[in-house]
Each structure stands twice: as C-alpha cells, then as structure tokens.
Regions:
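N-terminal secretory signal peptides that target proteins for export/translocation
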Residues: 1-4
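N-terminal maturation segment of proteins
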Residues: 20-556
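Bacterial N-terminal signal peptides
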Residues: 8-19
Length: 556
C-alpha cells in the first residue's frame, strides 16, 4: 500500500492503542519495494525519451557532450534490468533500446557534426518540408505556429553552428566532397529568395479559418518578420559561406575512407545502417551476387508522363492501391498522406520522397513528387515503395501504436523501413497493380537499384572506385541517364552506407517470408505474416529475425 502519510498509518495501525503519540523507540520505515522489472524498464525508456528527444540536428559541442553522457548513463541503467524476468514484448523493448544506445555511444567516436551539409535530406530541406506540412494542416492551432517560430530560431542557431563546425572541419581535414557542396548551393539560393513562392511562406497563405483575427494578425506579423529577418538571411549566409570559403577547400574525392579514421567510420556506418557486423567486402559480394541474380530486365519503353500532370497521376493511382490493400493486410493506418510537387527539392533518381507526418497524422505525411527539369513517367513501383504499402504504411502504423514506448513509436530503423519499402514493391503483382510489362520492368528496376547500391557504395567508400567507375557501373546495370547517375553518386558520397538499407532489409523480409511459408505450409497466412512483421514497429534486422522465428514456432 502506498500514498499514505505517517499520520494516516498511525491512525490505521495504532487505533487500538491509548493514543497516537510517538513511540519511545523510533521504528524505521520499511524499505521501498523495488519496481518490477517491466515497470523498471518502462520508467527508464520513458525517462530517456523525456530527457533526450531525437534532436539529431543539434550539432554544438555542448549538446554532443551532454548527449554522450546521457546515452552512457541510460546504458548503465539498462544493465540493471533483469532481462530474463521480462515478458516477450518488454524483451523486445530491452533489446531494441540497448542496441540503439550502444550504436549511439560508438557513434560519438566519429565527427559527423563536421559534415553537416546534405543536398538530399539536409536541415534546410527538412525545415522547408515542415513548413509545407504546417501549411496543409487544416487543424493547426496558434500553438503550432508559435512552435514553428521557435523552430526558425533553432534553425538559425543550427546554421551558425554548422558554419563553425565546417571551419573546424577545414582545420582538421574533414570536408565534404566538392560536388556535394556544388549541389547544395542552388538549394540554399532558392530557399534564400524573399518571394511568395518560397516554401517558408506557405504557412502564411493557408491559416485555418478557426484562428481568430487577432491571433492571425499577430502570427502573420511575427512569421513574416522571422522569415524575412532571420531565416532567409541565415540561408543566404550559409550559401555565401559555402560558395566563398568552403567550396575552394572541399575535398576532390568522394570516399569516406579518404578522411581521418575513414575506414573505421565506414565500418561503423555499415553497422548502424544494417544492424549486423558485416564488412564492406561482405556487402560488396552480396551486391555483386544480387546484381547477377537479377540480370538485365527486359527493356520496355517507360509510360509517358501523364497528360493531367504527374502529381495528379499519383493521386489517381492511390485509389486502386487503397482498394487492393485489404487482400494482403489485416490492419491499415488510419492516417492518410498527401501527394504534392516539390520544385525546391533536388532531383534524385527515385523522383519520390516521403516525409513522415506527426502523431495521428497531424501534420500530415507527404509524398513529394520531384519532376525535375525533364518529363518523368509515372512509377507504380515507386509509389508502392514510398507510399502504400511501403514506407507510409509501415511508419504510420508504428506511430499509431500508442502502446509502444515512445522511442519505438517515433524512432527509426533504416534497414527495416527502407527494406519494407522494397518488399512492398514485390507485392504489386499480387495486388493486381502491374498491368503491363512496362510496370513490371519498373518494379524489377527498383530492386536492381537497391542491389547496385551495395556495389557502388562499397566501391566508392572501401574499394577505391573513381567517380567514373561508379558512373559506368550505374549506366551498365541501371541504364540511367547522366543526371540521374551523377545524382546517385553524390547521394552515396553524402550518406555512406545508407543506401545499403534498401537491399539488405528487403532481402531479410523475403527470406523471413520464404522461411515462414516453408515451415507453416498450408497454415501460412500472408495477412497474419504482415501483421506480425509490422505490429511491433521498426527494429534491427537480427532482432526482427529472432522475433519472427519465435512467432513461426508458436504458429506451427
């Protein structure tokens, strides 16, 4: 029994005595009962989330030092939880949390903060995406706009710290590749222009009618001032620094192994991405074997760009996809996503970019269609990969699981999510969504892109490949044009090992399904398999494998 004051206990326990005066000899209070292991674990993971939310863009020395201290402290606390006394669900939490802490602590060995520029998914683009999300949130309250204002202040501090870090990187021999910096410049130039088309002004164009006139006037004034006087100058300052001071000192090579501790750094990034201690040589061999297995898909002319526009074509495609999903999934996310164009994003070879939404779909998730300069065909496989039943389905279901600890509900695991996206492409035929040879060829090409990434990524970062070698390999096995090939090479250079997540994760999902079908035979139910895969959220692949094998054994 808890929650009683000493006086209360006196009234209950000593009622039969002559009075409630203090006893002659003090009686020591009973020792507090230690929390049950499950409660102990839950307290630890929730306290961690409250103390150290995933603000991965904070790159100041003080923040990094504090973060390392926090990660170590919680890792020590976790070792005090008796894992063998936990139930199956809590053991998953224990294992996932422990792995993430270990990976995080090891990561502080390497100075990622000295290379903050990413022309594909960098802080400026993420801030622009948040602005677009707020603009399309029909239920946004004034508090959401005030939070956006605070986000602008945080971003300005980030740009200042990024410049300071890059100057330190120059002194220490850590700089980004020249081509990566060159690719970042037009993005910052576009996001630094003071005109109404700038995505940062989007929230001003569509405030919900529910916001009262006085609040609307205040927010409009404050946002206009913050954007014009803080945010846009910060982007211009970052642009000018990159162009005038950093670009002349940027490195000519692409390989992470060309930097101090580069080989160890790359090995760590492989482990962080795929969750297993495979070497670059191991990954390269797997990639070569997969490229050979897939061979050259039959050549088919791509479907021409739709007359009603690419964005509208993807919106139209969502209707039959939604209708087909219940055949393979017993649970679908409640939150939807929006499909929009994004001229301010760089042109990647995939042409679709997924931005997760907030809890319960507020703000909404977005699939961005990046048409680029030339006309692009509709890609059914790309939509399945980025939207449904791919990344959106997996991430939205995870976010809607209110029973999961918050670090799992809102955390990320690249090999799981990207691998699920590739696995989703393989479901297109069963869903009846590949009506012709062109769409089937497009699906095969999506798998080949992920296989090729294993070879090119390891080639660039561990095997001394030149840009020309990477270009030739991409042209030979993907048939992509020059801009797409160059874009892919710069993406691999910017994000070493991240491209491995797609193929390594996709292979794991296919292997688990094949094993389940073989083991369960006629009892195998694909809807149940998908439910079991997704219901606990993203996790490292080896932990997923152990979980699924336990499910298979219980289902026999």
């Amino acid at each position: 029994m808890t929650g009683f004051s000493p006086l209360g206990w006196c009234g209950l326990a000593l009622l039969a005595l002559a009075g409630c005066g203090a006893p002659a000899t003090p009686v020591p209070a009973p020792a507090a009962k230690p929390p049950a292991p499950i409660d102990q674990l839950n307290r630890i993971v929730e306290a961690y989330w409250d103390e150290h939310k995933p603000t991965e863009h904070a790159i100041s020395p003080q923040f990094l030092a504090d973060s390392l201290s926090i990660e170590r402290r919680y890792l020590t606390q976790l070792t005090g939880v008796p894992r063998d006394q936990l139930d199956a669900s809590s053991r998953l939490t224990y294992d996932i949390f422990g792995r993430r802490l270990e990976i995080a602590v090891e990561g502080f060995t390497f100075p990622d903060e000295l290379l903050p520029i990413d022309p594909f998914d960098g802080m400026p683009q993420q801030l622009a995406a948040r602005s677009e999300q707020l603009a399309h949130d029909a239920a946004a309250a004034p508090a959401a706009y005030d939070e956006w204002l605070r986000g602008i202040d945080d971003y300005v501090r980030w740009t200042q710290q990024a410049i300071a870090n890059m100057r330190q990187g120059i002194r220490r021999g850590y700089t980004s590749p020249r081509t990566v910096v060159e690719r970042m410049l037009p993005i910052l130039e576009r996001l630094g222009v003071d005109d109404s088309a700038n995505p940062f002004y989007a929230p001003l164009r569509s405030m919900p009618d529910s916001i009262k006139a006085a609040e609307r006037a205040r927010l409009t004034k404050d946002l206009t001032s913050a954007i014009a006087d803080k945010l846009l100058p910060a982007n211009r300052a970052l642009h000018d620094f990159l162009q005038k001071e950093y670009l002349p000192r940027a490195r000519a090579g692409l390989a992470l192994s060309g930097l101090p501790l580069g080989s160890q750094w790359y090995a760590y990034r492989i482990k962080r991405t795929i969750g297993t201690p495979l070497s670059a040589d191991d990954i390269n061999r797997i990639g070569v074997a997969e490229v050979e297995r897939l061979g050259s898909p039959p050549a088919h002319e791509a479907t021409p760009a739709p007359a009603n526009g690419l964005v509208n074509a993807y919106r139209d495609l969502e209707v039959p996809v939604q209708a087909a999903l219940p055949a393979l999934f017993s649970e679908l996310p409640k939150s939807s996503f929006e499909i929009r164009g994004a001229e301010w994003l760089p042109q990647p070879a995939t042409a679709l970019y997924y931005e997760p939404g907030g809890p319960n779909g507020v703000p909404p998730a977005i699939v961005y269609v990046i048409a680029g300069k030339g006309a692009r065909p509709l890609s059914i496989a790309g939509f399945l990969q980025a939207g449904l039943p791919g990344r959106h389905l997996q991430i939205a279901l995870q976010q809607e699981r209110a029973d999961l600890p918050r670090f799992r509900r809102f955390g990320a695991e690249a090999a799981f999510t990207d691998g699920w996206g590739l696995y989703a492409v393989s479901l297109g035929e069963a869903l009846g969504l590949y009506p012709d040879e062109s769409s089937k060829s497009d699906a095969a090409a999506a798998e080949m892109r992920c296989a090729v990434a294993l070879v090119v990524d390891t080639g660039l970062h561990a095997k001394g490949w030149t840009r020309g070698q990477a270009f030739d390999y991409l042209r030979t096995h993907l048939g992509v044009d020059d801009p797409d090939a160059q874009s892919l090479i710069d993406w691999y250079a910017t994000n070493p090992a991240e491209a491995m997540a797609c193929m390594m994760g996709g292979m794991k999902f296919r292997a688990l399904r094949a094993h389940a079908q073989q083991l369960l035979g006629g009892r195998f139910d694909l809807r149940e398999f998908h439910h079991e895969i997704l219901k606990d959220g993203a996790m490292p692949l080896d932990i997923l494998e152990a979980k699924m094998k336990a499910w298979m054994d219980a289902s026999k």
